[in-house]
């Protein structure tokens, strides 16, 4: 009934009203006159004031949200420094709270003033990093692009909840089309690809582990983890491995680390084979093998194509499912834009100096097609606001069936896409999916290629400048990523000689 009333403009039946029109008008007038003579109760005064400051659901009416956004633009500008100013927001870089004493606070009895509350919100950003400032140097926290910011904000205005179809409606296209676009980028069948926007790179890692546990231990959905299945990852894998293994109930002791090459930071596939051979002999199952496809600083890529071949040679013992190969590409994913770049024609006119690096990175990411699932952060090398992380999986039908619990939720299915049945979260904001989707649409392939290549051009320009300074030395000149690490010594010290010591 609710659905029919909200989706269709159906006229009420003739007997819908209990009173005839003249009688209902008289009754309403009498009721209004009586109410006008009585004082408004306090709760109604509070409610009236609060309701007047909520966003308007209708066009052409006074909208408190629009008014506050206008004021917000002015507040935003006050936080920004003048050009050439410091790398932080506002005027005070100090931390203005003490821990844990900051928590010794109570809720006010009286209702607050909207302008005052929003002024206090702005004050919270005093001293915060200004990611768009050229003086701000942090590894992978870029400024969000405008398309993604506005898209994300729209979700907050209309509270799109992407747990199921009726609460999201066409907003679900952002997540579904992301799956198709990224599936195409990776080299999978886009229609068979699925994705879930989740709480960060840690969420992607956790989903990758959960996928492996559910596929390898079929009874675990109902009976829990009763077998010490193993997680295999390199020594360079992200520390979230500990969070994911602990929270999934498998335990950190079941993480097995593969040695990495000292020069390349890549997984040693010979050692990987030794580990898999040993586990197979002991009849110990492997849940998930994780390839790190782009470490934060060194931008190292594990040879995932070779890992796939070795993993397939050592299947799990009888009675267990096939292990999942998860690619942790939350940092390195966007290099996949160069796997099909025409390096001979070089349409974006990159310098010869960086073409080889772009090709090297693109070739490494071309191997993502061998993965069962890939983790992607748009809020890192995607220039989208936090949090917009995407867990991408190759076989949507398998993943969703494996994780679909039996029965139905009390929410009725009204659309073909209802991820609430198999996601770790239930309620999910559309902010991340809209930000990621808007970024993909806005940048396109050439835009992303241009911004990535442009950073490399700048990186090597900085590298040349550092070489001219005797008291400075670049310590990662051979890395192929976006990060430049350098040391600064006192003026009278030969930086290169000192660093070699």
Model region roles, listed by residue range:
Residues 32-192:
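N-terminal entrance/gating region of PLP-dependent enzymes' catalytic architecture
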Residues 102, 158-166, 189-196, 225-229, ...:
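Glycine- and acidic
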Residues 143-248:
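Well-ordered mid-protein domain cores that form the structural environment of catalytic cofactors
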Residues 191-192, 476-483:
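Short Gly/Ser/Thr- and Asp/Glu-enriched loop/turn motifs at secondary-structure junctions
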Residues 200-203, 207, 211-400:
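Conserved PLP-enzyme active-site core in the AAT-like
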Residues 295, 299, 346-478, 489-492:
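Active-site C-terminal subdomain of aminotransferase-like
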Residues 299, 482-501:
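Conserved PLP-binding active-site segment of the aspartate aminotransferase-like
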């Amino acid at each position: 009934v609710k659905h029919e009333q909200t989706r269709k403009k159906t006229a009420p039946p003739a007997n819908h009203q209990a009173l005839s029109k003249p009688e209902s008008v008289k009754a309403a007038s009498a009721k209004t006159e009586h109410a006008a003579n009585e004082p408004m109760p306090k709760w109604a005064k509070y409610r009236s004031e609060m309701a007047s400051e909520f966003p308007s659901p209708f066009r052409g009416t006074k909208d408190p949200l629009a008014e506050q956004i206008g004021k917000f633009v002015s507040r935003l500008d006050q936080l920004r420094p003048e050009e050439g100013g410091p790398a932080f927001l506002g005027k005070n870089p100090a931390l203005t709270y003490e821990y844990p004493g900051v928590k010794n606070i109570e809720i006010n009895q009286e209702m607050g003033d909207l302008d005052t509350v929003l002024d206090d919100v702005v004050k919270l950003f005093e001293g915060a990093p200004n990611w768009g400032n050229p003086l701000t140097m942090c590894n992978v926290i870029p400024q969000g692009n405008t398309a993604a910011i506005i898209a994300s904000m729209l979700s907050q205005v209309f509270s799109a909840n992407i747990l199921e179809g009726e609460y999201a409606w066409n907003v679900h296209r952002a997540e579904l089309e992301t799956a198709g676009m990224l599936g195409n980028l990776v080299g999978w069948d886009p229609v068979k690809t699925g994705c879930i926007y989740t709480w960060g790179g840690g969420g992607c890692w956790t989903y990758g582990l959960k996928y492996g546990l559910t596929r390898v231990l079929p009874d675990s959905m109902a009976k829990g983890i009763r077998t010490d299945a193993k997680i295999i990852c390199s020594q360079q894998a992200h520390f979230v491995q500990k969070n994911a293994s602990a929270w999934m109930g498998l335990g950190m002791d079941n993480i097995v680390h593969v040695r990495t090459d000292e020069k390349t930071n890549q997984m040693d596939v010979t050692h990987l084979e030794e580990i898999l051979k040993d586990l197979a002999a002991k009849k110990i199952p492997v849940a998930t093998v994780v390839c790190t496809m782009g470490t934060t600083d060194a931008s190292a890529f594990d040879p995932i194509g070779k890992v796939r071949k070795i993993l397939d040679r050592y299947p799990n013992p009888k009675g267990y499912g096939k292990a999942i190969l998860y690619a942790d590409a939350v940092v390195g994913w966007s290099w996949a834009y160069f796997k099909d770049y025409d390096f001979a024609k070089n349409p974006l006119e990159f310098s010869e100096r960086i073409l080889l690096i772009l090709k090297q990175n693109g070739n490494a990411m071309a191997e993502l097609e061998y993965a069962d699932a890939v983790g992607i952060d748009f809020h890192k090398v995607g220039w989208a606001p936090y949090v917009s992380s995407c867990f991408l999986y190759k076989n949507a039908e398998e993943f969703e069936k494996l994780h679909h619990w039996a029965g139905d939720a009390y929410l009725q299915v009204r659309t073909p896409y209802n991820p609430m049945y198999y996601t770790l979260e239930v309620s999910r904001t559309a902010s991340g999916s809209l930000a990621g989707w808007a970024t993909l649409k806005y940048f396109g392939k050439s835009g992303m290629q241009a911004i990535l290549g442009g950073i490399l051009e700048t990186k090597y320009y900085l590298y040349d400048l550092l070489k001219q300074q005797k008291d400075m030395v670049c310590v990662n000149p051979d890395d192929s990523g976006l990060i430049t690490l350098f040391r600064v010594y006192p003026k009278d010290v030969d930086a290169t000689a000192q660093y070699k010591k």
